[in-house]
Amino acid sequence: MAKKFEIVSQYEPAGDQPVAITQLVEGLEDGEAFQTLLGVTGSGKTFTMANVIAKVQRPTIILAHNKTLAAQLYGEMKSFFPHNAVEYFVSYYDYYQPEAYVPASDTYIAKDSSVNEQIEQLRLSATKALMERKDVVLIATVSAIYGLGDPDQYLKMILQLRLGDTISQRDILQQLTTMQYTRNDVELWRGCFRVRGDVIDVFPAEAEEYAVRIELFDDEVDSLAWFDPLTGEVLTRPTRITVYPKSHYVTPKERVLQTIEQVKVELVSRLEELRSLNKLVEAQRLEERTRLDIEMMSELGYCSGIENYSRYLSGRASGEPPPTLLDYLPKNALMFIDESHVTIPQIGGMYKGDRSRKENLVTFGFRLPSAMDNRPMRFDEFEKIMPQTIFVSATPGKYEAEHESKIVEQVVRPTGLLDPVLEVRPALTQVDDLLGEIRLRVEKEERVLVTTLTKRMAENLTEYLEEHNVRVRYLHSDIDTVERIEIIRDLRLGEFDVLVGINLLREGLDIPEVSLVAILDADKEGFLRSDRSLIQTIGRAARNVAGKAILYADKITKSMQKAIDETERRRAKQIQHNTEQGITPQKLNKKITDILEDSPYAPKPGASAAKLKAAEADGEYSPQEMQRMTPAQLASEIKRMEKQMYQAAKDLDFELAAKLRDDLKRLKSSMVGVGDLR
């Protein structure tokens, strides 16, 4: 019997949430293709989404525009649905340099990348959940529109065994090898298998803490078990098991052989074309590179850059969209697009950037024309397969306005907090005036966010404030995601009082201690001072009872007026609701550790208190130390500790092994958001 979504929370919907939930559910039941949840900052949009999911009982995908927000959503949804499958699907690259050619300098750049094994495991776990369960909430980034293995081919590669099945050990081992599992009779790692007599142990690629044991008697499956690979303890003895491939990109051998023949035909045609244009260097280059790929595929079943032949491997015609994560979704799936005013343009922009790079590779003989079909989805292709969709944003964009059937407002916060008080002050004296406002906030132990137009202005302002003994930090684009989280955490802890930034102080920044947002040069029309940008930035002060936003400007622009009018409209509605209900705005008491704990690797609900205590009391690294480590240091330390853990298990020191496992979980939590933000 399929599990149902069961929401777990100490809170009941409040403020505008009950009405918003009812209206959204009614819209879904009426078959509305698109709806918009216009939810202000701090109104509990994630809680509303969770309640809608629980009401409609449908598998759901939530798209976010970067890994940091995806990790926050994952943490929140995991706490709301501890008994259901909450999964995480983002780019698994810590570092990614795509293949490229620069004609101006005749420079070829080979593809270079570093894969995060923990995130790869979570991606495999996500697709497995979609295939096996209906109670799935999947948090994903724009990585969802990039090519993934064809779901039909992927399903064909699955190994399914039942008690009493007749199958030889040789056939099982051959199938595991075809699924890209590696034999390792010494140590059982994720994605490996070992053989001991008639017993085959497999550590599934998507699993985190369990492995499969297959015992044969002659050519019959005599026993099946799930066991702990660390301790060897048998957890359950099912009557059947399913082992999924190690990669989404595994392909049956027949399909690879078919691909080789198709590549040969295209190569002959393309070489004739290049030679007819007298492009002899390009023709020679293409022939050498492609013949090498063909030889590798013939011998090994794959080659470096095999994704460039994905059109043939997936059996698509020229120009057809690639198979993506969205092809794995059930037909009755529901989609939320979080911060849709940012996420939708991001989805639309991926195809164009990828195409311009590929055109150079094809034109200059580095790739066959079919490589153009190894690409992210175009936006029109994405639209065609979108399930019923709810856009979620405080400032919906043009696309949402054109496609929504109805707007559901969530303006009143459950806490009774109001949108900040707005003031417009002259830009001529903005720096000195700001300094005075900062001093007032520092006396009250409150924090300040300041947003400028350019990097140089931000640097100069930071220097000026430092000279006047203000504890200030500067947040800029060169700072990676983990360090950014650390800076925000230090701001909340009071390590410094003022944070200066450019375009980084908008969506998803949750700092209840901030009582003042200052927007310098607010009257300079443009992307950073559009009405949506202004509303989002003003919203950063909406989580504080004394929230205030100051716009420094010499004139009021159309964008400013729109932002002021919308903020005042929302504030009036909030005041009216509080007066009618007798509500006094409540200060938010969000734990400072929350921003670091909201991670796909946090200890699972229900983990024993003893294990958690061991991790907290005896962990080798404090949270601060972990956050200061570079991605390379983290990866190295994780590998070292994994070796220690398995060695401890070998030595039968299970207490030490369990402690190391818990310490590893804490270290892995620091890996979220590192690197590529797809």
From Swiss-Prot:
Where in the cell does this protein reside? Cytoplasm
Residue intervals of the Helicase ATP-binding domain: 26-185
Tell me the SUPFAM superfamilies matching this sequence: C-terminal UvrC-binding domain of UvrB, P-loop containing nucleoside triphosphate hydrolases
Short motif Beta-hairpin, span: 92-115
- Name the GO cellular-component terms: cytoplasm; excinuclease repair complex
Q: Which superkingdom? A: Bacteria
Q: Which InterPro entries match?
A: Helicase/UvrB_N (IPR006935), Helicase_ATP-bd (IPR014001), Helicase_C-like (IPR001650), P-loop_NTPase (IPR027417), UVR_dom (IPR001943), UVR_dom_sf (IPR036876), UvrB (IPR004807), UvrB_inter (IPR041471)
Q: What are the recorded Gene Ontology BP terms?
A: nucleotide-excision repair; SOS response
What residue stretches are annotated with the UVR domain?
Answer: 635-670
The ranges of region (Disordered) come to 597-630
Question: Which CDD domains does this one have?
Answer: DEXHc_UvrB, SF2_C_UvrB
Question: Which of this chain's residues are annotated to bind ATP?
Answer: G39, V40, T41, G42, S43, G44, K45, T46
The chain positions of domain Helicase C-terminal read 430-596
User: Cytoplasm as a keyword?
Assistant: yes
Q: Which UniProt keywords apply?
A: ATP-binding, Cytoplasm, DNA damage, DNA excision, DNA repair, Excision nuclease, Helicase, Hydrolase, Nucleotide-binding, SOS response
**Keyword Transmembrane applies:** no
Q: Which GO terms describe its molecular function?
A: ATP binding; ATP hydrolysis activity; DNA binding; excinuclease ABC activity; helicase activity
| Entry remark concerning the domains of this protein | The beta-hairpin motif is involved in DNA binding.
Q: What does this protein do?
A: The UvrABC repair system catalyzes the recognition and processing of DNA lesions. A damage recognition complex composed of 2 UvrA and 2 UvrB subunits scans DNA for abnormalities. Upon binding of the UvrA(2)B(2) complex to a putative damaged site, the DNA wraps around one UvrB monomer. DNA wrap is dependent on ATP binding by UvrB and probably causes local melting of the DNA helix, facilitating insertion of UvrB beta-hairpin between the DNA strands. Then UvrB probes one DNA strand for the presence of a lesion.
Note the subunit structure: Forms a heterotetramer with UvrA during the search for lesions. Interacts with UvrC in an incision complex.
Provide the family line.
Belongs to the UvrB family.
Could you tell me what this protein is called?
A: UvrABC system protein B
Identify the taxonomic lineage of the organism of origin: Bacteria, Pseudomonadati, Pseudomonadota, Gammaproteobacteria, Thiotrichales
